[in-house]
A protein has these predicted regions:
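Extended interfacial segments that mediate partner engagement and assembly in macromolecular machines
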Residues: 40-134, 145
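Flexible, glycine-/basic-rich loop-and-beta segments that form/coincide
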Residues: 234, 242-257
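A conserved beta-strand element that flanks and buttresses the S-adenosyl-L-methionine
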Residues: 162
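Conserved SAM-binding strand-loop segment of SAM-dependent methyltransferases
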Residues: 139-150
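N-terminal juxtadomain amphipathic helix
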Residues: 1-79, 237, 248
Length: 257
């Protein structure tokens, strides 16, 4: 069923799409087998904007595997160094050394090793049974589940959370943000990254509009996603040559919405 209201604030979408992309793949993950390839058809992606909060989004149903984080490779080389520096700064600046941090959508848990190296106690939440099994064999503390389905995350509450390019995949980002909020201590800190919509538009990277990505954030709409759900925004910057947005937020139980 096509959505007519915003995924974030539940207000109306503009009636006409901002953009329609023709001949797009039904999904961005999983290779098709021979039979599936024969029967596969492209789709049109209609990209809408909320009349109220401005969030740009698809109005389609999520792909079947949206609860899972699918990554092709481990983190190594320059990427690992960059992530470690990021986590060291996060740990030091926000007094998170030896505190419990959970990664929402952690795949096989490779990032958890880096969080541990930054002297935080790393936990992960992942829906894929295969990924959880691999993570546990590596000695990582990974919990099986999807944040949108869980009221209380095992071993919680947590002092902080991280979420790397996952929020754009979920069909109900408001619910996910609220579930995270409810599993943090009163002053819990979060670090989140998402793709930068303005970069996609400025560089005409229309192939980055995929059925897997349901929400397309700008700095302002990402700030609003958290500030409208009882978080204070502490930082918000462009990273990775402006490909992504990084936001740091703090739970504020006193905040009135």
């Amino acid at each position: 069923m096509l959505k007519k209201s915003c995924r974030l604030c539940n207000q109306k979408l503009f009636e006409k799409p901002l953009l329609t992309l023709h001949g797009m793949p039904k999904a961005a993950q999983h290779f098709l087998n021979k039979d599936e390839l024969f029967n596969d058809e492209s789709i049109d992606l209609d990209i809408f904007q909320c009349m109220s909060c401005g969030l740009v989004q698809l109005n389609i149903e999520p792909v079947s595997y949206f609860k899972e984080v699918i990554t092709a490779a481990s983190i190594s080389g320059d990427a690992k160094k960059s992530r470690l520096n990021q986590m060291l700064e996060f740990s030091t600046k926000y007094n998170l050394k030896n505190k419990k941090i959970i990664e929402i959508g952690c795949a096989k848990g490779n990032m958890l090793d880096i969080i541990e190296e930054a002297q935080m106690n790393a936990y992960g939440l992942e829906y894929s049974s295969d990924s959880v099994s691999i993570a546990k064999k590596e000695g990582r503390r990974v919990i099986k589940g999807f944040i949108g389905d869980i009221e209380e995350i095992k071993y919680g509450p947590y002092h902080g959370f991280v979420c790397f390019n996952y929020l754009e995949h979920v069909p109900d980002p408001k619910s996910v943000i609220n579930k995270i909020y409810n599993n943090l201590y009163s002053n819990g800190i979060g670090l989140i990254t998402v793709p930068n919509l303005e970069y996609l538009l400025n560089t005409k990277c229309f192939y980055e509009f995929v059925a897997d990505h349901l929400s397309y954030f700008t700095i302002e709409t990402l700030k609003n996603a958290f500030s409208s759900n009882k978080f204070d925004v502490l930082e918000c910057n462009l990273i990775n040559n402006e490909n992504d947005i990084l936001i740091i937020v703090k739970k504020n139980p006193q905040k009135k919405i």
